């Protein structure tokens, strides 16, 4: 698909004598499913076309969400709608994510793409304006359940026992035993599950408790603090 678009873009360059930018909405949620949505694919495609075609330097891919997700897309859309004075809900009520809508054009809310969309709206505290086969409350609860079930299976595969218990069941590793409790190298700390940046070494201090201690967190860490009494 991208190759066809690129070839057509080259024909526009030749005919109109203009530079062409190809904008695509591929995002990180597509990487595992679609090989042609991965960053390395577009890097390779651009490189190959530039070697094999005249004036291919006048064609570029614009992939603003290649490292983002559907939350990133919706958040960007909300800001853009505010900037140009249009109603976000009206715009998105005219979109559809599902690959299997019913005869009335309603999404089931159960496909992978549906669930990603539903959870993105939830993350931003919004209700999806499109009509689903079932109520919003029901499709939302199903999406939350499926996500938890999928993530639990994934983390059981990927994490060792103590990592799984700490991240999924709120367990605590014994003090002075963890991999990073006495870590002194400069660097950044990321969540082993979701990959979000949580802390940097500049935030770390020696509390003497036997666990890694930080006096603050990254501004995008989204950590929920719970008072321990």
Regions found by a protein language model. Give the residues of each.
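A short Gly-Trp-Pro
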Residues: 147-229
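Nucleotide-activated chemistry modules centered on ATP-dependent adenylation/adenylyltransferase
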Residues: 1-146
């Amino acid at each position: 698909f991208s190759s066809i678009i690129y070839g057509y873009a080259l024909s526009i360059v030749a005919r109109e004598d203009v530079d062409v930018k190809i904008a695509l909405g591929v995002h990180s949620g597509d990487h595992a499913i679609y090989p042609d949505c991965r960053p390395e694919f577009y890097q390779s495609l651009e490189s190959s076309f530039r070697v094999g075609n005249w004036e291919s330097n006048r064609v570029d891919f614009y992939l603003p969400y290649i490292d983002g997700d559907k939350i990133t897309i919706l958040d960007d859309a909300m800001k853009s709608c505010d900037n140009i004075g249009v109603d976000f809900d009206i715009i998105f009520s005219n979109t559809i994510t599902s690959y299997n809508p019913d005869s009335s054009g309603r999404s089931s809310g159960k496909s992978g793409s549906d669930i990603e969309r539903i959870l993105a709206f939830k993350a931003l505290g919004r209700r999806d304006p499109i009509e689903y086969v079932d109520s919003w409350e029901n499709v939302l609860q199903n999406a939350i359940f499926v996500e938890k079930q999928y993530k639990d299976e994934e983390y059981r595969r990927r994490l060792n026992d103590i990592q799984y218990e700490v991240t999924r069941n709120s367990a605590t590793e014994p003090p002075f035993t963890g991999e990073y409790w006495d870590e002194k190298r400069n660097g950044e700390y990321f969540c082993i599950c979701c990959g979000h940046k949580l802390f940097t070494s500049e935030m770390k201090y020696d509390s003497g408790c036997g666990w890694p201690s930080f006096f603050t967190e990254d501004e995008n860490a989204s950590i929920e603090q719970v008072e321990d009494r």
